[in-house]
Amino acid sequence: MLEVFEKLVSSPTAAEQGFYVLITVIESLEYDEFEFYIPTIWAIVFGQPEKFRAEKFVKAFLLLISHFIVKHGSIKLVDSMNSVQANIFSLVVKQLWVPHLKLITGAIELKLVAVASTRIIHFLGECPAILDPANIELWGKMLDGIVTLLSWPEQDRVEEEQEMLYIAENVGNTPTFAHLYNAAKKEEDPLKDIKDPKEVLVASLAGLSSRFPGRYPQIINQYLDPANQAALLQLCNTYNCQII
């Protein structure tokens, strides 16, 4: 599997498909069954910086780490990435996650990424490091991205992208690739028990603010777009949640 993934990610035309192979692994196995390989996987990904200029690559990467979070938890994701390079997770959030959140499309994918992003800001919000000004800004901008994803119509936040599918000839025709890739591309909801990611978001924020009253309204006022502040307030009213 690791060999297939590395070949795909290194391919000039099929790089993002490597993430769909890994999604199958993440969804199928317990963490301790592939934990040993995780640092190598992240090292392979971060060793392809030029690939992150491609929107498809980044979106597939966000889907991968979102699957990771909802199946195995935020702490394991953060710790495993930072074991490869100190504080690289913060760079991932700042340079990749936040700018590309609004580009996620598809009902299942949107719910997955929104819930995973909510769990990340909840995790970060509970960390003492949130008091660092740089982390406060990161948290606020990520929340702004989540609200954009959940409240803006798709046509207002996503530029139309031409759909193109490439299969690397030296990888894509192997039985291993075909099985893993096709399994990952099935339209299966990994969060069947969650009906509304908007409710998940405001409930999480209400929980954080009840533990740390006075902290989050100031961050929201500073870092959320005014339209997103209004949208968040409307969501809080809809679900009867307060951010204090």
Regions found by a protein language model. Name each.
Residues 1-244:
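Alpha-solenoid helical-repeat scaffold
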